[in-house]
């Protein structure tokens, strides 16, 4: 799997974006063809799909965790389906405590703490396990662009800082799909940000289904220490902004590609940088799950989702779910 950082031309158009535009048109045609020919699988439970229309982190994982907690509180049986990005998974697997991030993906390890989670590469392989588990609801993480799965309820996550970037499709831009098409079909839109004050113009036509959400720290970290931050997630800028808002003393940071599998050389380099700055290494939960054997040497910033309109979410979810 090719792992890319979010390039600047995905946010602001330049000559590179325009040079890549012909490939984006091919991508658009192939996506249309794939969707047109697909016959969606209807699973024997209500499917809540959490996705986005762009590449990079938009807070999907935190939304899935929020939904899992909500359904559990309401005594609704559910399972979570994750694509297991960054893993070497060969077959559909129910994630267990002994699994590693390399086996089932970093997101899989995180999500399994909140309910039964299945790591799957292909929709067709999920059905036997669903028939065995018999959940009332299936939360699907990042299958929005998959035309082979029927969705009963769709939540679209939008990062309020990046929004839709330069509005070009991959690879000229960050978009997987036309935003209007995605937003028109969505049941709910989560506008995810560390600082929110108003709805962007692009989302005002959908204001009745927009939920403002913040990703906020949920654990206590010593603010008298120096920290060197690193991450291998889709939107590292949000992580660094969260650290800044938490008023931690960040003396430096390093970014890796999304779902990055760290090498020993990477760790040695990070230790060296931290020592140079008399600092402690700090990272995201998604990265932290890859370092179980080093947890005493690395600090994790835990976060959770805080939303401004839980009543709207409850009304929509339990009306359909």
Curated annotation (Swiss-Prot):
What's this protein's function? Transfers the gamma-phosphate of ATP to the 4'-position of a tetraacyldisaccharide 1-phosphate intermediate (termed DS-1-P) to form tetraacyldisaccharide 1,4'-bis-phosphate (lipid IVA).
- Residues binding ATP, per UniProt: 54-61
State a single Pfam family of this protein: LpxK
Which InterPro entries does this entry report, sorted A to Z? LpxK, P-loop_NTPase
Question: Which named protein is this?
Answer: Tetraacyldisaccharide 4'-kinase
Q: Which UniProt keywords apply?
A: ATP-binding, Kinase, Lipid A biosynthesis, Lipid biosynthesis, Lipid metabolism, Nucleotide-binding, Transferase
Reactions this protein catalyses = a lipid A disaccharide + ATP = a lipid IVA + ADP + H(+)
Gene Ontology biological process terms from the UniProt entry = lipid A biosynthetic process; lipopolysaccharide core region biosynthetic process
Q: Which PANTHER family match?
A: TETRAACYLDISACCHARIDE 4'-KINASE, TETRAACYLDISACCHARIDE 4'-KINASE, MITOCHONDRIAL-RELATED
| UniProt similarity note | Belongs to the LpxK family.
The family database entries (HAMAP family) matched by this protein are listed as: LpxK (MF_00409)
Q: In which pathway does it act?
A: Glycolipid biosynthesis; lipid IV(A) biosynthesis; lipid IV(A) from (3R)-3-hydroxytetradecanoyl-[acyl-carrier-protein] and UDP-N-acetyl-alpha-D-glucosamine: step 6/6
Task: State any GO CC term.
Answer: plasma membrane
Q: Where are the transmembrane segments?
A: none
Entry's EC annotation: 2.7.1.130
Q: GO molecular function of the protein, one example?
A: ATP binding
């Amino acid at each position: 799997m090719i792992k890319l950082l979010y390039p600047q031309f995905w946010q602001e158009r330049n000559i590179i974006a325009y040079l890549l535009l012909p490939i984006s048109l091919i991508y658009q045609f192939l996506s249309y063809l794939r969707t047109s020919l697909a016959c969606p699988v209807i699973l024997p439970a209500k499917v809540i799909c959490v996705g986005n229309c762009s590449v990079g982190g938009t807070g999907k994982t935190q939304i899935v965790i929020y939904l899992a907690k909500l359904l559990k509180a309401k005594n609704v049986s559910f399972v979570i389906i994750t694509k297991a990005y960054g893993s070497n998974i060969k077959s559909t697997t129910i994630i267990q405590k002994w699994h590693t991030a390399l086996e089932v993906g970093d997101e899989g390890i995180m999500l399994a703490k909140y309910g039964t989670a299945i790591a799957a590469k292909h929709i067709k392989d999920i059905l036997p396990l669903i028939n065995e588990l018999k959940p009332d609801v299936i939360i699907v993480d990042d299958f929005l662009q998959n035309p082979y799965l029927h969705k009963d309820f769709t939540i679209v996550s939008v990062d309020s800082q990046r929004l839709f970037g330069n509005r070009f499709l991959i690879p000229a831009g960050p978009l997987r799909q036309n935003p209007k098409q995605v937003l028109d079909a969505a049941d709910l839109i989560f506008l995810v940000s560390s600082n929110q004050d108003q709805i962007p113009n692009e989302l005002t036509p959908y204001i009745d289904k927009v939920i403002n959400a913040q990703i906020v720290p949920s654990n206590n970290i010593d603010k008298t220490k120096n920290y060197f931050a690193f991450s291998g997630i889709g939107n590292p800028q949000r992580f660094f902004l969260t650290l800044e808002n938490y008023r931690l003393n960040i003396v430096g940071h390093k970014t890796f590609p999304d779902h990055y599998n760290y090498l020993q050389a990477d760790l040695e380099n990070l230790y060296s940088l931290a020592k140079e700055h008399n600092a402690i290494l700090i990272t995201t939960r998604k990265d932290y799950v890859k370092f179980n054997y080093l947890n005493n040497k690395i600090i994790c910033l835990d976060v959770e989702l805080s939303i401004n309109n839980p009543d709207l979410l409850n009304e929509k979810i339990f009306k359909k779910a």
